[in-house]
């Protein structure tokens, strides 16, 4: 049946106002009434988009921009403008979006996906913070997120993270420098060519944990 037939059937059944627009996929041999039921229920085609662990904010935006079925409203916006769209104009975006696979329908905006990832991270972070050990040398949720991001960059193996986190916590307790390469690389940014030099490790920076004590700002 074509679209006009479906609308007419819905009209006869008094349900024309319940039809929901969107992209649908129907199996071969489906009946008109089954199609009508699916359209009324709004069971549209959904597409996956994955935000991987360890991704930078730039990589997350690139994944959103590469999703052809999304409506792209974030392109051309600066990170601060994007965070303002989420209601947090002064918040740094790095590490604020929970790594997971999110599903969207055709025409949905990229901002909605970002909102979902942000809200999920906020929820998880709040739960983890409320259940933390009382004697940790970490004062805020943001510091906890920063430490978790550093640990994640140090190893891709989940079974090693607790051990590495323990090393960093002990260093923080005694006022020792963290001395971790990922923070230095992050501070170098796009200038990093894949090789970390002695000069890089000695160059003062808010992110150079071979120079500063404590955690970097983000």
Residue positions per predicted region:
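Signal peptide-directed extracytoplasmic domains
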Residues: 1-125
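Bacterial extracytoplasmic/cell-wall-associated proteins, especially those involved in peptidoglycan
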Residues: 68-71, 83-218
């Amino acid at each position: 049946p074509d679209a006009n037939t479906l609308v007419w059937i819905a009209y006869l059944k008094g349900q024309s106002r319940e039809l929901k627009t969107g992209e649908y996929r129907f199996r071969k041999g489906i009946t008109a009434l089954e199609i009508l039921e699916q359209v009324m229920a709004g069971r549209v085609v959904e597409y996956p988009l994955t935000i991987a662990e360890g991704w930078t904010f730039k990589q997350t935006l690139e994944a959103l921009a590469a999703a052809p079925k999304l409506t792209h409203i974030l392109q051309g916006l600066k990170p601060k403008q994007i965070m303002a769209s989420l209601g947090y104009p002064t918040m740094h975006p790095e590490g604020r979006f929970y790594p997971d696979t999110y599903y969207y329908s055709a025409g949905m905006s990229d901002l909605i996906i970002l909102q979902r990832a942000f809200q999920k991270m906020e929820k998880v972070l709040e739960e983890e913070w409320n259940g933390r050990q009382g004697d940790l040398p970490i004062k805020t949720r943001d510091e906890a997120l920063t430490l978790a991001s550093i640990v994640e960059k140090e190893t891709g193996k989940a079974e090693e993270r607790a051990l590495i986190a323990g090393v960093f916590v002990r260093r923080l307790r005694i006022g020792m420098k963290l001395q971790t390469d990922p923070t230095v690389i992050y501070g170098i940014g796009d200038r990093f060519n894949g090789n970390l030099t002695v000069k890089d490790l000695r160059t003062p920076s808010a992110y150079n944990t071979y120079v500063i004590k404590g955690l970097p700002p983000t």
